[in-house]
């Protein structure tokens, strides 16, 4: 793997330019100029249908659950053309998107790509709002804001009920049981349409600044907003990655991926990377959850992907299987170029365990663990760590075509970004759009960072949490929530799913603990002692008030999706938890509550 990372034909060497400004701020940019990129996403489909028509594009488990339903690029282009024609025939109102409610699937992909092929905007909403939420009001609010011309879901019997009373008039389409929903259309009818020259006429009219997708922000920092993603943004971002991961242009990627297309990681980073380079995406019906992670393990064993993308919780749940079965680990890692994490910070213990498994089953090829940093508003990647990292924390250096600015903000350096892959704004939200950019046109992403080595900016940026998450103790000492949270979850591994920190304007830090399945399986006293022991160890090591919680409370109720406390990717909205559980916060900092854990 060392040779791989040192081969400039496969990986771009780390090079970064620093520009200092008179006000104490500075910016980083890549010395590489951004090369030309596709006009629109549909150009990728057209290219591979012509150049490699028999190459696999998508695969999903068939109805038996044993085999795979597969679609090559020839069949994908045929299906996209048919569905695009059907959409044109419907004469849907201009400006009204195609909204998709259900999980990743081939039909989902075909409809999304068909809409974009003819300049119609697509929007995938998290299926959790339809299937897992007890209250459909959030879904209804999103639909009313989006004003869709067409709503699709995989199964009318599963998703149809959530549409009742949504207050939106739109064509409804289902792949299964359409007859169970009044007025609905079967997806088969769209696939049966005969493509006419009108499809390619509409395709020719798609411009780089045409809206390709709407994605809703995760809500990890506030109320979800509708983010405009243009074709220019998405195509440019894949070109940026291709100039950094140069091997992508030589080796069509093979992915096994569960990450939802309602989020930028799964949709714009992973799915678009496959389509841009003529690769294959095996849609993983598994999830990082008990009873579902086993499906992911099976799929990884069968497919042996070349790239592995996941959130930290996904790696945490995979590790016990890989650690217990060397044969499985050897198969999963046999073709793997890299393991990539994003969307949340990776605990140091997880990093070390992944490296240890790889060292055992492929000792001559160390596992390249890497990451990137970005947002829904940035297509998503802003940075890439395209060199060997010694551990978690570094988010890499800016990609070609982007400028990353560091602005002093209190105790931190706030990061802001400008470039071709940054969004033009939020849909129908001029005030929020104006607030998102500073006077020089940099997007205010809200994250903080600092240089790993100020004298050598090419060594990358260290992520330093959210600017708005941090708080001061009554002593005036700042608490860096993002950094401390990752440390605490790692120290409590594997017994904590996540923690939320408290202590704003108080004398001490408190910690609300969401136990993991392993933590919940312990007797309450044993879990309390585990937490108390960790707090004692931190205190005895001399950790200061900003680095050592003085109390903890284990929460019996898991984070609520309906209340916005957690996203379907598994990361916590700190603000929502603190607001909803204000009573628990008060208990935590009061004296005399027997359930509050202290180091003693």
Which residue ranges define each predicted feature?
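Conserved pre-ATP/AMP-binding loop-to-beta segment of ANL
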Residues: 53-54, 173-175, 182-216, 223, ...
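Conserved ATP-binding/catalytic segment of the ANL
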Residues: 413-473, 597-599
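Conserved AMP-binding A3 loop
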Residues: 69-74, 203-204, 212-239
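Conserved AMP-binding/adenylation subdomain of ANL enzymes
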Residues: 235-254, 262-330
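N-lobe entry segment of adenylate-forming
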Residues: 1-71, 75-90, 94, 118, ...
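Conserved AMP-binding/adenylate-forming core of the ANL superfamily
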Residues: 33, 57-113, 130-140, 188-195, ...
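Gly/Ser/Thr-rich phosphate-binding loop
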Residues: 189, 277, 297, 306-310, ...
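Conserved ATP-dependent adenylate/AMP-binding module captured primarily in the ANL superfamily
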Residues: 129-164, 195, 237-256, 289-306
């Amino acid at each position: 793997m060392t040779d791989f990372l040192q081969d400039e034909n496969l990986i771009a060497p780390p090079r970064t330019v620093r520009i200092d400004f008179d006000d104490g701020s500075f910016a980083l940019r890549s010395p590489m100029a951004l090369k030309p990129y596709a006009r629109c996403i549909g150009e990728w489909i057209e290219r591979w249908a012509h150049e490699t028509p028999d190459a696999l594009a998508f695969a999903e488990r068939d109805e038996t659950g044993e085999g795979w339903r597969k679609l090559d690029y020839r069949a994908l282009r045929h299906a996209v053309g048919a569905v695009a024609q059907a959409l044109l025939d419907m004469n849907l109102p201009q400006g009204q998107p195609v909204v998709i409610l259900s999980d990743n699937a081939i039909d989902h992909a075909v409809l999304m790509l068909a809409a974009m092929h003819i300049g119609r905007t697509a929007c995938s909403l998290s299926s959790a709002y339809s299937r897992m939420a007890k209250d459909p009001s959030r879904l209804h609010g999103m639909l009313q804001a989006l004003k869709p011309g067409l709503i699709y879901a995989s199964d009318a019997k599963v998703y149809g009920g959530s549409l009742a009373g949504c207050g939106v008039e739109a064509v409804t389409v289902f792949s299964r049981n359409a007859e169970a929903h009044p007025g609905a259309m079967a997806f088969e009818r769209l696939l049966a349409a005969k493509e006419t020259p009108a499809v390619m006429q509409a395709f020719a009219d798609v411009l780089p600044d045409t809206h390709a997708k709407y994605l809703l922000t995760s809500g990890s920092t506030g109320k979800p907003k509708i983010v405009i993603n243009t074709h220019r943004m998405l195509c440019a971002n894949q070109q940026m990655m291709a100039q950094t991961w140069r091997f992508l242009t030589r080796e069509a990627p093979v992915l096994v991926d569960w990450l939802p297309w309602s989020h930028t990681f799964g949709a714009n980073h992973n799915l678009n990377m496959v389509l841009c380079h003529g690769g294959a995406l095996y849609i993983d019906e598994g999830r990082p959850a008990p009873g579902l992670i086993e499906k992911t393990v099976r799929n990884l064993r069968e497919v042996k992907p070349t790239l592995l993308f996941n959130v930290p919780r996904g790696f945490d749940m995979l590790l016990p299987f890989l650690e217990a079965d060397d044969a499985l680990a050897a198969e999963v890692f046999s073709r793997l170029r890299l393991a990539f994490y994003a969307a949340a910070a990776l605990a140091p213990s997880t990093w070390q365990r992944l490296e240890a498994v790889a060292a055992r089953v492929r000792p001559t090829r160390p596992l390249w663990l890497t990451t990137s940093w970005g947002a829904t508003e940035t297509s998503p990647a802003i940075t890439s760590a395209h060199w060997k990292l010694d551990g978690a924390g570094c988010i890499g250096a800016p990609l070609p075509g982007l400028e990353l600015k560091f602005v002093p903000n209190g105790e931190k350096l706030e990061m802001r970004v400008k470039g071709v892959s940054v969004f033009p704004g939020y849909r129908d939200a001029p005030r929020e759009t104006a607030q998102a950019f500073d006077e020089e046109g940099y997007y205010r992403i809200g994250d903080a960072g600092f240089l790993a080595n100020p004298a050598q900016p090419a060594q990358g940026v260290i992520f330093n949490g959210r600017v708005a998450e941090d708080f001061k103790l009554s002593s005036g000492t700042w608490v860096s929530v993002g950094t401390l949270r990752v440390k605490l979850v790692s120290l409590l591994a594997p017994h904590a799913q996540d923690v939320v920190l408290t202590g704003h304007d108080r004398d001490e830090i408190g910690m609300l603990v969401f136990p993991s399945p392993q933590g919940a399986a312990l007797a309450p006293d044993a879990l309390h002692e585990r937490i108390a022991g960790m707090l004692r160890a931190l205190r005895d090591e001399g950790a200061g008030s900003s680095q050592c919680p003085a109390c903890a409370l284990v929460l019996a109720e898991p984070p609520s999706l309906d209340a916005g406390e957690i996203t379907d990717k598994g990361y916590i909205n700190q603000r929502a938890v603190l607001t909803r559980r204000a009573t628990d916060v008060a208990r935590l900092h009061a004296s005399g509550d027997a359930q509050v854990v202290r180091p003693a």
